[in-house]
Each structure stands twice: as C-alpha cells, then as structure tokens.
C-alpha cells in the first residue's frame, strides 16, 4: 500500500503499557482490559478531540482464543468508556498483527473512509487458554488432546507439509544454519538489545509512551535484563535442539509477554481537531509471504517493497527498527542489508 499520493496519514500519539513477562505482573489482567487501558490513555491525552470523532478502533491480536472475546477491539471501545457509536475490529497477522492494525487504519484514512482512528495491538500470553477440539460424535471413547493457545501450532491440518509446522525456535535454528550464524553472534546481539533497552529506560526515553496500569506494580518492562554478561548467556543450554547442534537459547530468544500498545492516527482535518503536532507521517507499508520454515526472514522483502512504494532507499532512513523474535532471525534479515549500521 502506498498512501502518500492519496491522503497524508499522521501519527499523533503513541502509548503502551509496560511489557509484563509470562506469569508476571499482568498475570491477573485480562487482555481486553489491557487494550481498553491504552485506548483510554490516548483519549485522555488528547482532550481537544471529541471521542465521538473516532471513526474506528483497529487492534491486532494473534491469540484471541479466550478473554479477548472474539473482537478485543470492540471490547476495548466499550470498556474504555468511548461512545457506543465508535466501532472496533480485530485483525490477525500473527506476529505482525499490531502493525497490520496500523496498516488497515492508515489505509482507511488515506482513502477518506476515516479521519481519526486508533490502531494497536494486545496480547496476554499468560492468560491464553487451553483448548480442546470438539468431538465429531457424542460420548467419544478415549482421551481428548489439549493445546495451549499461548504460542505455536494447534489442531494442525495433517495435509500441511511437516517442514512447515515446526516450532518458531526450530525455524530460528534453520535461519542460523542458513547463514552460518553462531551461538556467540546470537548471544552478542541479544546482550546488546538488553543493553540498549536498559540504557533507554535509564535515559527516560520511554517515559512519554508508557502508561502504567492502575493497581499493578509495574512501571518498566519486566523482561529487560540489566547487567547481563556474555558469561551468563553462554551458560544457558539450547532450548529447541538438544543434540549438540542447537544455538537458540532462552537468552537469545524473545520472551513470552503480556501488554498492549496503541497509536492515534489522523488525516489533516483530524490532526487539526486534536490541537497536536504529529509525531510522524506514514509513507508506505507492505506485506509479503515466505516459506513458513523461514518465517523470520519475511521483513526482508516486505521492507524492500515498502521502500519502493515510498520512493526511498535504506540510506534515506535515520532509524531502522526490526522485529527481534530471535537473535538468529534478526541477524538473518541483516544479512540482506550489510550497509546498515547495527548500532
């Protein structure tokens, strides 16, 4: 989608909760309440904007099997106390669900279908339920299989090729093999990520965007490891391969998390109604598919397509933010962009 030639779309504000770890501070907080919290925060921080002017609320939600209640965006609208006339819709593009929400809201604004929208994402991996498939007949004999909806495949179609249904961690191992990414390189990259996050917190760079959840004693991200050392990371054993060939560990993988984030998006008219200066303008977006066993390399082609739509090149970008599901996955993507400064 290239939207620059249609209507300009502005990011007016951005908020998020602190990110809680699996079973951590947000263990007792429902995902619809997390989503409502960031929606309400955006409204409260923009007092000049009449909430009735919000044309849509779009949220990404990759799990959505439990308290998300089918359409967590609409639940957030109602729980946040917005007018009942404000609609809400939930989208799912797995790890990219929150970004997909931003794309869809921006597209609506660019095409004139909306002037003001809220777009975000929410997950509670802690509270994602266990599920059991309904039997095909009454009173079946034997036992029923149960799946966790926190992460990974469930109720896999037997027609799906086995190499496509591997775990995310095994996919990271395949990427490490493909590019010869060592365990040491992954650990160094992960350690640097934690250092950057800790330094950003210390410098107050997150203070304006983070909105703590009332009643929960959490004001900073729970999973940032301050003071980690190469020696500590080296002691951890590989999680997904135990045959001596594994390189992916808990330390160089993303943790399981709970949290929510949201953006306030507008066109020119909506921007004027907020009385605010924009943080950014959305120029272009793109999505792409890839062999499922190499899912983490999807950003490479998507970034190239988005840059082409925007008429830009990597050299035009001042800051480049890349999803880091696994250090191996991020390093695999960076193989395509050797000119980037990894700092």
Which role fits each region the language model picked out?
Residues 2-80, 171-183, 200, 290, ...:
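Conserved active-site "lid/cap" helical segment
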Residues 16-17, 27-28, 32-37, 48, ...:
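N-terminal extracellular/periplasmic Venus flytrap/periplasmic-binding protein-like
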Residues 17-43, 63-66, 89-106, 115, ...:
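Active-site pocket-shaping loop/turn-to-helix segments
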Residues 29, 61-117, 149-152, 163-167, ...:
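Conserved catalytic cysteine-centered active-site region
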Residues 51-60, 87-92, 117-121, 187-192, ...:
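Beta-strand segments within the central parallel beta-sheet cores of soluble alpha/beta enzyme folds
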Residues 65-71, 218-219, 224, 292-299, ...:
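Short glycine/threonine-rich loop-to-helix capping motif typified by GTGT followed
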Residues 92-123, 170, 176-205, 262-270, ...:
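Active-site-proximal alpha-helical scaffold in enzymes
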Residues 116-174:
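Flexible glycine-/small-residue-enriched beta->alpha junction loops
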């Amino acid at each position: 989608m290239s939207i620059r030639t249609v209507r300009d779309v502005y990011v007016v504000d951005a908020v998020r909760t602190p990110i809680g770890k699996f079973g951590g501070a947000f263990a007792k907080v429902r995902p619809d309440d997390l989503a409502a919290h960031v929606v309400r925060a955006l409204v409260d921080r923009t007092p000049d904007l009449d909430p009735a002017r919000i044309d849509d609320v779009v949220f990404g939600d990759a799990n959505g099997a439990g308290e998300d209640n089918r359409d967590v965006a609409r639940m957030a609208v109602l729980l946040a106390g917005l007018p009942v006339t404000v609609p809400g819709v939930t989208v799912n593009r797995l790890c990219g669900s929150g970004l997909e929400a931003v794309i869809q809201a921006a597209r609506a604004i660019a095409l004139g279908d909306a002037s003001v929208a809220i777009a975000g994402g929410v997950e509670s991996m802690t509270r994602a339920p266990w599920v059991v498939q309904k039997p095909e007949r009454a009173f079946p004999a034997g036992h029923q299989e149960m799946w966790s909806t926190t992460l990974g495949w469930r109720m896999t179609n037997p027609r799906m090729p086995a190499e496509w249904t591997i775990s995310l961690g095994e996919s990271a191992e395949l990427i490490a093999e493909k590019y010869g990414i060592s365990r040491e390189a992954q650990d160094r990259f992960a350690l640097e990520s934690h250092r950057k996050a800790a330094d950003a917190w210390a410098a107050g760079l997150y203070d304006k965007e983070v909105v703590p959840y009332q009643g929960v004693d959490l004001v900073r991200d729970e999973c940032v490891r301050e003071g980690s050392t190469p020696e500590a990371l080296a002691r951890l054993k590989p999680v997904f391969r135990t045959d001596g060939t594994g390189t992916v560990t808990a330390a160089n993988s993303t943790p399981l998390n709970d949290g929510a984030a949201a953006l306030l998006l507008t066109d020119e008219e909506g921007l004027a109604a907020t009385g605010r200066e924009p943080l950014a303008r959305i120029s272009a977006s793109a999505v792409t598919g890839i062999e499922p066993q190499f899912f983490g390399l999807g950003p490479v082609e998507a970034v190239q397509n988005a840059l082409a739509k925007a008429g830009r090149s990597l050299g035009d970008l001042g800051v480049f933010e890349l999803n880091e599901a696994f250090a191996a996955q991020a390093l695999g993507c960076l193989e395509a962009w050797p000119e980037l400064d990894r700092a």
